[in-house]
Amino acid sequence: MSKITEKVELLAEPIVKEEGCELWSVEYVREAGTWYLRVFIDKEGGVDILDCERISRRLDPILDEEDPIPDSYVFEVGSDA
């Protein structure tokens, strides 16, 4: 696990839990020349788009403030399924 994904996990974990979900994994990958930061979540009964939206809206400003990633990237929150 990279230092970037470790830092993002630390930032994301409390938010994900407050929203009633579980943090499944974090990945930071380069695809076709673009960096992607992906936060995968899960919850009993399944994750819906509103779960992803709420977590994304809460986590995005924290990532902007903490700035754990030096490059520009696309931020996504999705389900592990």
Where are these regions (language model features)?
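Short Lys/Arg-rich amphipathic alpha-helical segments
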Residues: 1-81
